[in-house]
């Protein structure tokens, strides 16, 4: 199949034809396209979200693989990586295999999964996973030290020391975030950083980094809807974090859904988490349309850099790479979730200028501007089902 339209290709915008099946087979100037996108629509490499809590399994009342990945496709994301803290947790050989099968059956986007810290490192390391997630409570564990020494796979760090989980939320200070960096070494990615100092030190230590939109935009923790880990920081800290948008490697959603009943509990009892996986892509490209960010930086943040961190052939319009695309237009609208089980977020009604018109996954339309189609994504880390390069 041939598609044609304006595209971000070779570091510029040009009208090109792209031949696709599951992969990008050819790129040239002209063709007789099967699909031709409108003049006001722009073809981009599909976004990659390295930090999504899909839930499912015994937590399906919060969110399922189908609803989370449908919401991701609606937000222009072609690949999500799932966190292991569902129920039961994904931290054994058997649970990793079960989790992969759950995604194979129900995912509307391509996917990868992280394992939790485990005693079964040698067995799990043989499986097609994205890497491992290290939580604050893991930092003092012997298994974490073994993991850091033995596994070459990516380790994603929640940057807070164990003490942060034992003190009142108002005392979960920035120094606890910075101190956590010194517990780890090697192939480490530091996620949902909340302040600029942590970004600088993490980069000095050779780690890749990300931030979330809500740590930039949400005006303090006012209630259960805005409660999140790590906590939303004060105004000046959030203002400083905007500098990080030009230095971090990627932007993630940290999509963390909970039921309405859970979010209606007393503030001290309600679980933390904001679920807006579909917000990140239109938000970042809205900054481009506002001339606050250039398009090359936006594509690097959402597509090219996460693919490099994960060491997979995604994130670029390039022959041999996976045929995942986001098609956007300049269009004023106000944000709402659409396919997620979560219907209320602190980002609701946020004004955006970029709108996702289509999401293409594995060469097939996953989101057509109105509906998510019943396609099946693949495990981006399973080389047997992946790509020819």
Curated annotation (Swiss-Prot):
Known catalytic reactions: (S)-dihydroorotate + H2O = N-carbamoyl-L-aspartate + H(+)
Binding note for cofactor: Binds 2 Zn(2+) ions per subunit.
Residues where Zn(2+) 2 binds: 133, 158, 192
Binding site for substrate: 53-55, 85, 258, 272-273
Active site per database record: 254
Name of one Pfam family that matches: Amidohydro_1
EC number: 3.5.2.3
Top-level division of the source organism's lineage: Archaea
Gene3D superfamilies with a match to the protein in the record: Metal-dependent hydrolases
Residues carrying N6-carboxylysine: 133
Family: Belongs to the metallo-dependent hydrolases superfamily. DHOase family. Class I DHOase subfamily.
Record's protein name: Dihydroorotase
Organism whose genome encodes this protein: Sulfurisphaera tokodaii (strain DSM 16993 / JCM 10545 / NBRC 100140 / 7)
């Amino acid at each position: 199949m041939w598609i044609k339209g304006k595209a971000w290709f070779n570091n510029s915008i040009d009208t090109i034809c792209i031949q696709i099946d599951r992969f990008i087979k050819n790129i040239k100037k002209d063709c007789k396209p099967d699909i031709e996108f409108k003049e006001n629509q722009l073809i981009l490499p599909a976004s990659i979200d390295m930090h999504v809590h899909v839930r499912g399994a015994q937590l399906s009342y919060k969110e399922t693989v189908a609803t989370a990945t449908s919401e991701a496709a609606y937000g222009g994301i072609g690949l999500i990586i799932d966190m292991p803290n569902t129920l039961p947790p994904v931290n054994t050989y058997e649970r990793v295999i079960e989790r992969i099968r759950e995604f194979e059956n129900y995912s509307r986007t391509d996917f990868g999964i992280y394992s939790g810290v485990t005693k079964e490192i040698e067995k799990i390391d043989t499986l097609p996973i994205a890497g491992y997630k290290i939580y604050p409570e893991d930092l003092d564990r012997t298994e974490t030290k073994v993991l850091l020494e033995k596994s070459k796979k990516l380790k994603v760090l929640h940057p807070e020391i164990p003490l942060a989980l034992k003190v009142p939320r108002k005392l979960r200070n920035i120094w606890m975030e910075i101190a956590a960096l010194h517990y780890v070494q090697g192939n480490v990615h530091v996620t949902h950083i909340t302040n600029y100092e942590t970004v600088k030190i993490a980069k000095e230590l050779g780690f890749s980094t990300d931030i979330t939109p809500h740590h930039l935009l949400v005006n303090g923790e006012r209630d259960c809807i805005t409660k999140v880990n790590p906590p939303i920081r004060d105004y000046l800290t959030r203002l400083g974090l905007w500098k990080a948008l030009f230095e971090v490697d990627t932007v993630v959603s940290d999509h963390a859904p909970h039921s309405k009943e859970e979010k209606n509990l007393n503030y001290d009892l309600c679980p933390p988490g904001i679920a807006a996986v579909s917000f990140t892509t239109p938000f970042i490209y809205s900054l481009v349309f506002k001339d606050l960010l250039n398009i090359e930086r936006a594509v690097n943040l959402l597509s090219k850099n996460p693919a490099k961190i994960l060491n997979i052939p995604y994130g670029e319009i390039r022959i041999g790479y996976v045929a995942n695309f986001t098609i956007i237009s300049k269009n004023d609208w106000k944000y709402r979730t659409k396919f997620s089980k979560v219907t209320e977020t602190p980002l609701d009604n946020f004004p955006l200028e970029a709108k996702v018109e289509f999401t293409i996954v594995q060469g097939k339309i996953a989101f057509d501007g109105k509906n998510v189609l019943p396609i099946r994504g693949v495990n981006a880390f399973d080389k047997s089902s992946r790509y020819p390069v």
